[in-house]
Amino acid sequence: MEGLTKFLSTAPVLIMALLTFTAGLLIEFNRFYPDLLFHPLG
């Protein structure tokens, strides 16, 4: 049971770190290549 509570307390921290890293990566990518994220359908 101790492992479960430890996992439940660290999972939100890991998810927030991963989301922050992904958002930062997308922001930097969009800053250098602003037209590559949105591909036109045509």
UniProtKB/Swiss-Prot annotation:
The chain crosses the membrane at residues 7-27. One of its GO terms (cellular component) is photosystem I. Gene3D superfamilies: Single helix bin. It is found in: Cellular thylakoid membrane. Keywords: Membrane, Photosynthesis, Photosystem I, Thylakoid, Transmembrane, Transmembrane helix. The keyword Membrane applies. GO terms for biological process: photosynthesis. The keyword Membrane applies. Pfam families: PSI_PsaJ. Its main location: membrane. It is a single-pass membrane protein. May help in the organization of the PsaE and PsaF subunits. Belongs to the PsaJ family. HAMAP family: PSI_PsaJ. This is Photosystem I reaction center subunit IX.
